[in-house]
Amino acid sequence: MAWMLDCLFASAFEPRPRRVSVLGGAPGQNSDRSMDMVSIHSLSELERLKLQETAYHELVARHFLSEFKPDRALPTDRPNTLEKWFLMLRGQDRAASLKTFGIRLEEVLVNELTRRKQRELTPTMQVEDINGSTGRRRRGNVVQRMLGRMRRFFSRRRNEPTLPREFTRRGRRGAVSADSADELENGALLLQILQLSQLSSPIGQRLLGSKRKMSLNPIAQQIPQIVETCCKFIEKHGLSSVGIFTIEYSLRRVLELRELFDKGLDIVLDDSVNVHDVAELLKEFFREMKDPLLPDDLYMSFLLTATLKPKDQVSALQLLVYLMPPCHSDTLERLLKALHKITENCEDSIGVDGQLVPGNRMTSTNLALVFGTALLKKGKLANKESRKTKLGIDHYVASVNVVRAMIDNWDILFQVPPHIQKEVAKRVWKSSPEALDFIRRRNLRKIQSARIKMEEDALLSDPVENSAEAQAAILAQSQPFDEDPEGAPDVHEVLNDNLNYDFEDESDFEDQDHLDLAEVPYLDVIPNNEDTDSDADVIPGPSEEPAVPASTAGSPDKEEGAAGNPPNADRPLPRVPQGKKGKFATRFFP
């Protein structure tokens, strides 16, 4: 018993004879100075899929997915039965049948989008009913529409999304990307659309043999309204509430809030709402979710991380987060962010007015005890074992350890380190070299636009002072010609070499010796300041002739007398830039 309590409240479990070494160094440390960690939200859909492939193969190589079998990914049934479809033919029944609690996360997002669209179409439907000529004609129109919808329903392919056509213009991509924002009248609805073609698909079905077209733009965040609303309210009113998520609540008020969210109304929680009622509502949402927030096909893999050292555990959790569907990972990140803010206010502090602010007493361990079993639940795809795992660790204790580590390191879990970015770049290039080039150039344009905006904002705030400071900074960073360091790279040459790298020129893409992706910026590109009229596909080399100033160019009449001394022999020759072979720097000599 003492050993179990030790495991529960210690930072990690006792060392085991066999440990799993995870790819990469310590979490949060960047071993490659040329690249920075980036958020998974900045990755396009194609990059996100390649990131999942990279994490999957890495975890398989480290024996983290030994319990996972891809052949368990069987086709799923239609999410809507015939009886439910008949109930949804009418607008009122359809809106009332779309729930929020007790269903899968994907269905929650789909229902929110459907309810919003239904509210927009309700006035139009009422006008059509008023303008109808006779009741029989209206009944005939209803029957005709019902039969037409039934024909379309039964003629729909098995794995086709169940939303209307206007909802799924980008459904073939499996996830809605930011480039489809202009295709919807209300851009806010875009955030609620999700991976419709991958609905309820286990990890094996998501990774094996996908032939869908992928977007090259980032995926929109997919967070349910109830999670976003409750987290915002708790962050605003509950950070100083002692014992939040554990104090008694009003059951009647929780049921009222639950009914409001089931109706799909745009709920605004004001100061009159008790924060403990909102906290209980959030707990019930995750507890009653049909599928756990952490996918059940990764259940044993998450528990296995509890046997690692803290550094290796966070790295393993990072790879497992990459394998989660976007809607699950986005919702998990939003929840962990709110829980981490609560832990930052667990101790007493002194306020701005000098008064003592009591802490909420909710550490990461206490919060993990509350959400451990709600986030990590054994589902239908998990092996039916006893409560003790093969490693001799209690499931409950292991789940608390995992959730606690995720709360403490929530900001690292959703970042992509440089060495993973390199692997993703390899896989993207192997599938589509043009896509990799497009992504790099797009990121370059974003960086250029951001820097231009920063400069404009600085000049607008104080034009005279900031312009002088900017010029002084540029002059301070520029070095004299005679003090040029040996081998210093030129920004333009490095950028051109990176953007126009020939992968097929006597180099194997899989060979690390021939291709060092550390010098090829993937998601953190060096800004390109070259002229827009220049040809970016031409890489200047040392074989080009140096530009000679017009004042030193000899006339054709004097070329024949090259053996003689020029008229201005007594004057010193001007310094002419000369490309030095094998060096990136530009040397000047007299």
Curated annotation (Swiss-Prot):
The record marks 246 as: Arginine finger. Gene3D superfamilies: Rho GTPase activation protein (1.10.555.10). It comes from the Eukaryota. It comes from Mus musculus (Mouse). GTPase activator for the Rho-type GTPases by converting them to an inactive GDP-bound state. GO terms for biological process: signal transduction. PROSITE patterns: RHOGAP. Signal peptide: none annotated. One of its GO terms (molecular function) is GTPase activator activity. Residues 214-414 form the Rho-GAP domain. This is Rho GTPase-activating protein 36. Pfam families: RhoGAP (PF00620). The keyword tRNA processing does not apply. May interacts (via the Rho-GAP domain) with the active form of RAC1. Residues 526-590 are annotated as: Disordered. Keywords: GTPase activation.
